Swiss-Prot record:
Keywords: Amino-acid biosynthesis, Cytoplasm, Lyase, Methionine biosynthesis. Its cofactor is pyridoxal 5'-phosphate. The keyword Heme does not apply. This is Cystathionine beta lyase. Pathway: Amino-acid biosynthesis; L-methionine biosynthesis via de novo pathway; L-homocysteine from L-cystathionine: step 1/1. It is found in: Cytoplasm. One of its GO terms (biological process) is methionine biosynthetic process. Disulfide bonds: none annotated. It catalyses: L,L-cystathionine + H2O = L-homocysteine + pyruvate + NH4(+); an S-substituted L-cysteine + H2O = a thiol + pyruvate + NH4(+). GO terms for cellular component: cytoplasm. Belongs to the trans-sulfuration enzymes family.
Length: 17
């Protein structure tokens, strides 16, 4: 998870952290 929230479509992070 990104601490700042990632774009899950691109980064694979959940976008909610």
């Amino acid at each position: 998870h990104d601490v700042y929230g990632g774009d899950y479509r691109i980064t694979g992070d959940d976008g909610h952290s």
